[in-house]
């Protein structure tokens, strides 16, 4: 993955993103951790990550995203998704509640970034 970031920079790509799909036949690297490592090879262009909000605790996610955003002067772009039933089942999440969990997670993250107590 680190080599891919370097190759993307050398190829002149405009942005760098990682996904959040825990159920995959391919090797999966936790997005926050791998993106932090990839930044050393990326440079100062926009970067970001997808997070399937129903699968995340909002306080942990708010901390991780704020940390990532602080690692580079380049813009960090947060992508938010709902996920599918396979992702939820793998994490023990009832995906019938995914829209509510998504909205709640986003509200808590925004409140924390504004300095509010939650």
Question: Predicted regions span which residues?
Answer:
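N-terminal beta1-alpha1-beta2 module of alpha/beta enzyme domains
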Residues: 1-42, 48
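Structural preference for beta-strand elements that scaffold enzyme active sites
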Residues: 15, 46-50, 75-79
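Generic structural signal for well-ordered secondary structure
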Residues: 27-31, 54, 61
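Histidine-centered beta-alpha loop that forms part of the nucleotide-sugar donor binding/catalytic region
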Residues: 20-21, 50-52, 81-83
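Short amphipathic alpha-helical segments at helix-loop
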Residues: 19, 49, 90-94
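Active-site mouth loops of central-metabolism enzymes
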Residues: 1, 49-59
């Amino acid at each position: 993955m680190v080599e891919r970031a370097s190759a993307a920079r050398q190829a002149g790509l405009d942005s760098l993103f990682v996904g959040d799909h825990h159920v995959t036949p391919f090797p999966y690297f936790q997005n926050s951790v791998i993106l932090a490592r990839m930044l050393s090879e990326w440079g100062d262009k926009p970067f970001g990550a997808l997070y399937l909000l129903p699968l995340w605790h909002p306080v942990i996610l708010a901390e991780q995203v704020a940390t990532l955003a602080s690692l580079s002067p380049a813009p960090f772009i947060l992508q938010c998704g709902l996920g599918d039933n396979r992702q939820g089942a793998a994490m023990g999440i009832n995906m019938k509640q995914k829209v509510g969990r998504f909205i709640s997670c986003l509200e808590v993250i925004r409140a924390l970034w504004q300095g509010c107590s939650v």
